[in-house]
């Protein structure tokens, strides 16, 4: 396949056209008065969204050189979304500003590599300044404010996320699903829940709810199948004498063993429920170990030399309550040692950091949440499917933003944190005029987000930036929703520092590479016109031959 090569200003001009098309489409969504973007789908209704990365992902340009620029900036949005879960529009705007300013300096004859060194030095300096100015999140009100800002001013979403985080903790799992109805609601499962129900409906204790509920039960964890209860008789007698119920979790309970348990339950001799162990293969072993640590018990496994006939009551786990329905089992308030549970959580966290598989990471995080606190589900409602999807995008962004805020703290919102951080660049010392130009262009680019927020609100960004830089209060900012200057912390207009920092870091990383680009190579486009001409010329003659079919003896 033949290639086309472009050099110098011709290459950079094509690249910038692509950057502009993508960034200009994404940046209309920024701020409280940002607009929506409608995306056509090959099936079903179009998608309406304000999520920067969702918009960026849909853009592919026909011109291959322009498309290269667009794809590089798309990478900025994707990377920021991956790391911080929000701030994708800000990252895209910063990348566009750095590229456009950088290319101006390079076109004017400055050395691209030195300009990039200046950009890198400035970004590191600003990141340090942002982290130094961050405040720790103190209460659920601040969590709710972060969620509200990220959900485009929707207080209901902000409050719901704050409530969910309060219930399950920062380590807990919060998932977002589409609801069946119009209302958005929060469903919290406390304790450890896994997707295995009772093995027989005869275990039910609450006929109205079709559930088994046991108070203060012993929990037997067995790795293999139970087919015969003979080895367990001494243990079962000890449980009956203790006057407490029993929950059995094993690979399976079948045949005679299950029948014996059911008969004992029906006769009233033993309150019992049997469920299958969660997961498969190695994951099942890990989850049984998790339950053992949570409940203060031991997994009965012949691998470690423990036989069923030798099990004592001290080998069993226990908890405050278990609740089992036909699909799920929930263990509430396990009696395991707190120090052991924390050590297990730390071990799983380490595995999360080491794994390269997204699927494994998700499963490990689920295990961590079940050990650490619980699971909350936010069910997003709406009048139409399109509205539900748009709302779900905002809930996911808000959820990611609140997690980031809890992790690293918060700074003033509305683009002001970057604006004030740009002032710290006055003290940064670099070598040579070309590197100074790199620092200067970052200082200018840091104004781009607040200018875009004000532009989307129909206000002149230069006036707002000028007013804010004239005064000395670093908490002051511009409330674009109400068009007034306010104390941003007092008004609850705040951003997670992790989101702002990641947006700048990723934008500068890709933009710096684009600024240093001197040549671009792409496949030569097919000459469609000549191909089509050949076809049309050949057709009549070919078709004419078919007239001979009339002479066939049919």
Curated annotation (Swiss-Prot):
SUPFAM superfamilies from the UniProt entry: GroEL apical domain-like (SSF52029), GroEL equatorial domain-like (SSF48592), GroEL-intermediate domain like (SSF54849)
Reactions the enzyme catalyzes: ATP + H2O + a folded polypeptide = ADP + phosphate + an unfolded polypeptide
Enzyme Commission number: 5.6.1.7
CDD domains: GroEL
UniProt KW keywords: ATP-binding, Chaperone, Cytoplasm, Isomerase, Nucleotide-binding
InterPro entries assigned to the protein according to its UniProt record, in alphabetical order: Chaperonin_Cpn60_CS, Cpn60/GroEL, Cpn60/GroEL/TCP-1, GroEL-like_apical_dom_sf, GROEL-like_equatorial_sf, TCP-1-like_intermed_sf
Keyword Transmembrane helix: no
Residues reported in the UniProt entry to bind ATP: 29-32, 50, 86-90, 414, 495
Quaternary structure and partners: Forms a cylinder of 14 subunits composed of two heptameric rings stacked back-to-back. Interacts with the co-chaperonin GroES.
Annotated family: Belongs to the chaperonin (HSP60) family.
Protein's UniProt name: Chaperonin GroEL
Organism of this sequence: Pelagibacter ubique (strain HTCC1062)
Underlying gene: groEL
């Amino acid at each position: 396949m033949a290639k086309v090569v472009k050099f110098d200003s011709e290459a950079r001009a094509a690249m910038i056209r692509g950057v502009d098309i993508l960034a200009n489409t994404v940046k209309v969504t920024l701020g409280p008065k940002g607009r929506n973007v409608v995306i056509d789908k090959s099936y079903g209704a179009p998608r309406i969204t304000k999520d920067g990365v969702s918009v960026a992902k849909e853009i592919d340009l026909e011109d291959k050189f322009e498309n290269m620029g667009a794809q590089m900036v798309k990478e900025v949005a994707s990377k920021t979304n991956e790391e911080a879960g929000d701030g994708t529009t800000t990252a895209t705007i910063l990348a566009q500003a750095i590229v456009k300013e950088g290319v101006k300096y390079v076109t004017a004859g400055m050395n691209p590599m030195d300009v990039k060194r200046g950009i890198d030095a400035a970004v590191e300096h600003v990141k340090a300044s942002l982290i130094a100015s961050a405040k720790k999140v103190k209460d659920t009100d601040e969590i709710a404010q972060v969620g509200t800002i990220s959900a485009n001013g929707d207080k209901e979403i902000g409050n719901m996320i704050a409530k969910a985080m309060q219930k399950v903790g920062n380590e807990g799992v919060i998932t977002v699903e589409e609801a069946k109805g119009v209302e958005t609601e929060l469903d919290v499962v406390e304790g450890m829940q896994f997707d295995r129900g009772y093995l027989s409906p005869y275990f039910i204790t609450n006929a109205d709810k079709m559930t088994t509920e046991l108070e203060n039960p012993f929990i037997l964890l067995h790795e293999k199948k139970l087919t015969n209860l003979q080895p367990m008789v001494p243990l079962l007698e000890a449980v009956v004498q203790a006057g407490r119920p029993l929950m059995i979790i094993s690979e399976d309970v079948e045949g005679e063993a299950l029948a014996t348990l059911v008969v004992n339950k029906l006769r009233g001799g033993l309150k019992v429920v049997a469920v299958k162990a969660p997961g498969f293969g190695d994951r099942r072993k890990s989850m049984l170990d998790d339950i053992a640590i949570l409940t203060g018990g031991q997994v009965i496994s012949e691998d470690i030399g423990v036989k069923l006939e030798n099990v004592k009551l001290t080998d069993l786990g226990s908890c405050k309550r278990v609740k089992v329905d036909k699909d799920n089992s929930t263990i509430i308030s396990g009696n395991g040692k707190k120090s052991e549970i924390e050590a297990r959580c730390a071990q799983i966290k380490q595995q999360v950091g080491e794994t390269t598989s997204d699927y494994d990471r998700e499963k490990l995080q689920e295990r961590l949440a079940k050990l650490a606190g619980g699971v909350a589900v936010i069910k997003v409602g709406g009048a139409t499917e399109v509205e539900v999807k748009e709302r779900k995008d905002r809930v996911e962004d808000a959820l990611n933003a609140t997690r980031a805020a809890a992790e690293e703290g918060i700074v003033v919102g509305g683009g002001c944190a970057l604006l004030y951080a740009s002032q710290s660049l006055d003290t940064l010392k670099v070598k040579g005029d070309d590197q100074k130009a790199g620092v200067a262009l970052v200082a200018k680019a840091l104004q781009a987000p607040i200018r875009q927020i004000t532009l989307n609100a129909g206000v002149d960004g230069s006036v707002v930036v000028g007013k804010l830089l004239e005064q000395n209060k670093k908490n002051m900012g511009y409330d674009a929703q109400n068009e007034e200057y306010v104390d941003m912390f007092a008004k609850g207009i705040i951003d997670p520092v992790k989101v702002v920092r990641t947006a700048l870091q990723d934008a500068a990383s890709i933009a710096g590479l684009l600024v240093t680009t001197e040549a671009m190579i792409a496949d030569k486009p097919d000459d469609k016109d000549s191909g089509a001409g050949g076809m049309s010329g050949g057709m009549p003659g070919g078709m004419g031959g078919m007239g001979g079919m009339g002479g066939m003896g049919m």
